[in-house]
Structures are given as C-alpha cells and as structure tokens.
Amino acid sequence: MCPYTRAVGASIDVLRRVVLFSGLKDKQLKRIAEAMAERTFAAGEEITKEGEISVGFFVIEDGRARVTMSGDEVGQLGPGDHFGEIALIAETPRAATVTAETELRCHGMTSWDFRALVERNGEIAWEILASTARKLYENAERARGTPTRFPA
C-alpha cells in the first residue's frame, strides 16, 4: 500500500452511508473522518485487486473508478462512494478489483489505524459491533424468507 498524506478527513455524511458505521453518532463519525488520510491514484492505477488481501478502506472525494469481478465490469464508483470497509476488521481477500478511470482522490484508512482508533474509543467499537450484529440478523432473516427488521 502506498503512503498516505494526512489531510482533512472524509465527510461525515459520506461515512454515515457506510454500513459498518451506520450506528455511530456524528461525534464518533468525526473521529473516524479525522483519522483518515488523503490518497491520490493515477488513471489506470489498480487500487485493490480481486483475491488479494489488502488493508485499506477508501471514500472517493473526486474522480471515477471501475469495479470488476473475474474481469467483468460490475460497477462504477464516483465522489461519495466508498469501498473496502470489510478490510478494516478482517484480513479477507478483496471481492473485486477497483481501478481508477480518472485521477482519483480518496480519503483512506488502514486496518491498523482503525484498530488504534477503536481501541482508544470503546463506544465506537461497541456501536460497530451492534451494527454488524443487526446486519447479520437481517441477512439471516432474509435467507429464511422473512424480511423482518431488527430494531435499531
């Protein structure tokens, strides 16, 4: 992973849309945003590669990226979109390749920076755990064919 440069973090509104952070209060989201660093990718540069372990989470500030799986394009990303949140808490292979289509300016965070943040801020860790449990419950209910919402 290339080095990050410290800059003003991602916007709270963008972070609020990240499922992992959906239960956090603005004050907690601000702490995460402030811990993020700016990163720029050149057009054509691969940011993540399908099947490889990687440790970065990114929020796109400016530019466009292409998402591919098994070589087939499955999506486009632009300002306000994010990817890689699973990498913050689990060292699992990337599900897709993300390639910058234009120069891409992102705010990013590594898993070790995220871990340090949640170790210092237990309430953030607890809210993320609760949010993850709700999502697991919803997924299990959907798999059973009973789309019941778990109370927030």
Functional labels for PLM-detected ranges:
Residues M1-A152:
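Cytosolic regulatory regions built on CNB/CRP/Popeye-like sensor folds
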